[in-house]
Amino acid sequence: MINIRFPDGSIREFEAGVNSLDVAKSISPSLAKATMAAYIDDQLKDAKDAINSNCELRLITVKDPEGLEILRHSCAHLLAHAVKELYPNTEVTIGPVVDNGFYYDFSFKESIGEADLPTIEKKMKELAKKSAPISYRVVPKAEAIEFFKAQGENYKVEIIDSIADEQMKIYTQDNFSDLCRGPHIPNTSVLKAFKLTKLAGAYWRGNSDNEMLTRIYGTCWATKEDLEQYLNMLEEAEKRDHRKIGKVLDLFHFQEDSPGIAFWHDNGVRIWRQVEDYMRASNNKYGCSEIRTPLIADFSLWQKSGHASKYAENMFATKSENRDFAIRPMNCPTCVQVYNTKLHSYRDLPIRMAEFGIVHRNEPSGSLHGLLRVRSFTQDDGHIFCTPEQVEEEVILMVQQCFEVYKDFGFNDFAVKIALRPENRIGDDETWDKSEQMLKNALDANNVSYELLPGEGAFYGPKIEFHLKDAIGRSWQCGTIQLDFSMPQRLGATYIDKNGEKQVPVMLHRAIVGSLERFIGMLIEHYAGNLPLWLAPVQVAVMGISNNQDDYCKEVFIMLEKNGIRAKLDLRNEKIGFKIREHTLLRVPYLVILGKNEQEQKIITIRKHSGEDLGQMSVDDFCAFLDKQIQAKE
């Protein structure tokens, strides 16, 4: 007999060889039905793995994040199973879990398109209903190679060759087998709420020299209700797509002459200026001086900073006068050069610098996505040089600034996470202990709850991440606060301490909105293009019922502009209904409509974008009304 301890501290006795599914059944049939896998002494295992000794057991159900991930991973296998049934000559490659779903890459021998997805999905449902048990066997590497080679799965053979382990896991359901670390669900009947969503191309191992594979994306959920809710969200997201809205509102465009780099139009630049000016004022409030540094630097600087070894493939390089240069992928090294121009005392610290720095990264063309994934973007970078004793206080201020910014832009629901030390890192454990505790203390001081992400920090320091939730429930990673013990030392940054000796400052990297391009894309989708008044590219459209009001329209327009209102004058010889409809589609917050009565009484009639009639008032009163709304960031 063995003793199994449960999360509530209770201990129960079972026969040796029992599995987690049996344990779940002994508690309740419903729990057994919901069990996906289990943690046995902190190791994630299949639900049917035998337990032969005393242990601590935590059952994983579909309600747990790990359970949902396992469900989705098993659904990826179901997709591969269905594809092999329908297209037997297809080679399977990899099928990982991604946010809200999964994908699987295939090498098809025949042409396949979006129209084929319903057929594949139908086959998946047929296979799931078979309730085929899912099991695995562990075999020597050579045997696994022979197994997949015999099936003509050359990609699987290549994957196995690249793995150092001498033992391989092969999972089987019905007549389909796949290489996988697992764990997986007990049987296919659990898979009831899934949907194939799209098809795309993807190079094998992300290398454009390799074969272009077909990537099929899908989503999978614990219940059909959850699936329906997610699909509704996708439908709403499609309506909010910033690329479509950007075209309608004449904000920006992309073209093949400059892939991944936006062409900003007047309306888009107006939004950009509001975001940048707001951030500049926020930085001034928090004591940041503003700098501007070169986009191009000698390649030796990137070698010193470490970017050459880690980012070389993503950097744009050029030559001039027999020298190698690179366009910067990050702003940090050039910021350090500004710091290094002076001798600093500990009394000078902290030194806070901010920069709206343009960076370029050679992202794969297949990953580019409107403003959300580009090759050139402007980062609202901040870099703080301080003593170790000042770190906590500086982080407290940065957290406060982040919260203020997000709330002013209309993001009131966000999650905060701390990425902790990775396995490969610089610095001793004592330094990491102190650093991680400083970040925790800073969040505690702001009464912020947070999630810990073990192993996800950078090799040079832990970081705080801010994840914003938008109007339709999507989460966007936005700001970061990063401790850095490496770059100041690599680039020779120093200060003189109170004993007259040189010390290396701690460098804090902070980005609040991050990429301005991406943040504006987020704002467009969050508000579905109906930006709040203070951000709207055109705040008021002025129009007359007939051309008899043209002079008065011009007069009102000039008064609005003198009061700092971004107004548009529409004197076209069109019916008033047409003008109202057009400016409503353009998401202009307020429409000023002028007729004979308004002209004679020197008043204006105001209509909101929503269609609400605000009645009549003087231009001065309207300007005061708008100013109050703008100042309140409404």
Curated annotation (Swiss-Prot):
GO terms for cellular component: cytoplasm. Keywords: Aminoacyl-tRNA synthetase, ATP-binding, Cytoplasm, Ligase, Metal-binding, Nucleotide-binding, Protein biosynthesis, RNA-binding, tRNA-binding, Zinc. The gene is thrS. It is an enzyme of class 6 (ligase). InterPro entries: aa-tRNA-synt_IIb, aa-tRNA-synth_II, aa-tRNA-synth_II/BPL/LPL, Anticodon-bd, Anticodon-bd_dom_sf, Beta-grasp_dom_sf, TGS, TGS-like. This is Threonine--tRNA ligase. GO terms for biological process: threonyl-tRNA aminoacylation. CDD domains: TGS_ThrRS, ThrRS_anticodon, ThrRS_core. Residues 1-61 form the TGS domain. Pfam families: HGTP_anticodon (PF03129), TGS (PF02824), tRNA-synt_2b (PF00587), tRNA_SAD (PF07973). Belongs to the class-II aminoacyl-tRNA synthetase family. Residues 241-532 are annotated as: Catalytic. One of its GO terms (molecular function) is tRNA binding. Catalyzes the attachment of threonine to tRNA(Thr) in a two-step reaction: L-threonine is first activated by ATP to form Thr-AMP and then transferred to the acceptor end of tRNA(Thr). Also edits incorrectly charged L-seryl-tRNA(Thr). Gene3D superfamilies: 3.10.20.30, 3.30.54.20, Anticodon-binding domain, Bira Bifunctional Protein, Domain 2, Threonyl-trna Synthetase, Chain A, domain 2. Zn(2+) binds at residues 332, 383, 509. It comes from Francisella tularensis subsp. tularensis (strain SCHU S4 / Schu 4). It catalyses: tRNA(Thr) + L-threonine + ATP = L-threonyl-tRNA(Thr) + AMP + diphosphate + H(+). Its EC number is 6.1.1.3. NCBIfam families: thrS. It comes from the Bacteria.
